[in-house]
Amino acid sequence: MAAEPVEDNCINFVAMKFIDNTLYFIAEDDENLESDYFGKLESKLSVIRNLNDQVLFIDQGNRPLFEDMTDSDCRDNAPRTIFIISMYKDSQPRGMAVTISVKCEKISTLSCENKIISFKEMNPPDNIKDTKSDIIFFQRSVPGHDNKMQFESSSYEGYFLACEKERDLFKLILKKEDELGDRSIMFTVQNED
């Protein structure tokens, strides 16, 4: 049985141009080219825990903190413990692009603007016309750790969501990965729906 030929998936360039020391290629036919962006796909309701099994929740001050909770406490404190993880199509293969939101009175979306973790009062947008965003994180499984996830910032490469103890609180922060197997940047994500 003969193999079927595969249609070439190539771009014919007809010209080149230098603009500000950058070489640009001009395509003969660019109608099938896709611009860089994130496009919203679907959302899931999830509980996020650190490796000490503490549940991520939003306190009255809208701060993301981790706390010991039983499953019934977790249910009793919903919606502050249930996060909306919205998945996005990414024009570049870097992991599953996601936003993390919570709906208390209003929807707030996790941001790492200026490397500071906070919730912004906003719905996750349907499209983000860029390759980086302070609200997009790349959710990836951790090699060698069954069902453990990590979330890398799309704005700050090499920076991950992490759990850090500060006085008596366990806070969600953005942290540069400092060592292989850093457990502070690993989480479990339990889908509720």
From Swiss-Prot:
Primary location: cytoplasm
GO biological process: angiogenesis; cell population proliferation; cell-cell signaling; cellular response to lipopolysaccharide; cholesterol homeostasis; cytokine-mediated signaling pathway; defense response to Gram-positive bacterium; establishment of skin barrier
UniProt-annotated site: Cleavage, residues: D36, Y37, D71, S72
Subcellular location: Cytoplasm, Cytosol; Secreted
CDD domains noted in UniProt: beta-trefoil_IL18 (cd23298)
Propeptide intervals in chain numbering: 1-36
InterPro entries to which the protein is assigned, alphabetical: IL-18, IL-1_fam, IL1/FGF
Outcome of substituting H145A: Abolishes binding of the preformed binary complex of IL18 and IL18R1 to IL18RAP
GO cellular component: cytosol; extracellular region; extracellular space
Keywords: Cytokine, Cytoplasm, Inflammatory response, Secreted
Pfam families: IL1
Effect of E28A: Strongly decreased processing by CASP4 or CASP5
Impact reported for K120A: Reduces binding of the preformed binary complex of IL18 and IL18R1 to IL18RAP resulting in impaired IFNG production
Reported impact of D71A: Impairs binding to IL18R1 and the ability to induce IFNG production. Abolished cleavage by CASP3
Keyword set includes Secreted: yes
Effect caused by changing D36A: Abolished processing by CASP1 or CASP4 or CASP5 and maturation
Molecular function terms from GO: cytokine activity; interleukin-18 receptor binding
Family statement drawn from the similarity comment of this UniProt entry: Belongs to the IL-1 family.
SUBUNIT field: Forms a ternary complex with ligand-binding receptor subunit IL18R1 and signaling receptor subunit IL18RAP at the plasma membrane. Mature IL18 first binds to IL18R1 forming a low affinity binary complex, which then interacts with IL18RAP to form a high affinity ternary complex that signals inside the cell. Interacts with cargo receptor TMED10; the interaction mediates the translocation from the cytoplasm into the ERGIC (endoplasmic reticulum-Golgi intermediate compartment) and thereby secretion.
PANTHER family: INTERLEUKIN-1 FAMILY MEMBER (PTHR10078), INTERLEUKIN-18 (PTHR10078:SF35)
Name this protein carries in UniProt: Interleukin-18
